[in-house]
Amino acid sequence: MKKILFAFSAATLIMVSCQTAPEADKATATEQQETTNATGDNYTIDAAGSTIGWVGTKTGGQHNGTFLLSDGTFTLADGNLAGGSFNIDVSSLAVNDLTGDDKAKLEGHLKSGDFFQVDSFPTAKFEITSVVPFDAATNTSKLEGATHTISGNLTLRGETKNVTFPAIVKVEGTSVSAVADFNIDRTNWGLSYKGPNNPADWFIAKEVNLKLDVKAAKSTM
């Protein structure tokens, strides 16, 4: 019996070691926070020019892809990002490292009730609740050149959690951009294969890497 338990423990350690998400800041997740209506100049999200990249890790490898944005707005007060929100088209989920039938099969699998259940939850949303300057003296970040720390409510598959992560925010003329690279624990939003306690889910890393590249232009109206 001891040999069996030892073998199981060793196998578990091997599985975990092969499921490491890309090195990035780990976004802290807390309960949903109240949003405030920021006042200032509105900037319309450039859905065509913005992307959210993702990397999922499993035993033996990784897959990567993208989500597209539907719409959204950033609000700037005195030239600084103060608030905003954007909608994510979850049904746009694409797998970029596969082609042909393998690509279609994995995309269908991820969009099904096994994970994102896009037929019931086709849209995710991120609402900014706080933006503060990044203090390199008291904080560290794997994102080189981080300028701000952003917090916001992320609603995914009907679950809302507040996440905090470093970002690079740039305001240039009539445009603004926000770039971030961080990992989240997918189980906080109920994303698990056949349930969190199913052995099939153990082969998939809980942490998913997200790469945000969101652009917006000053609204003309």
Report each predicted region and the residues it spans:
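Low-complexity, acidic/polar, glycine-enriched regions of mature
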Residues: 18-221
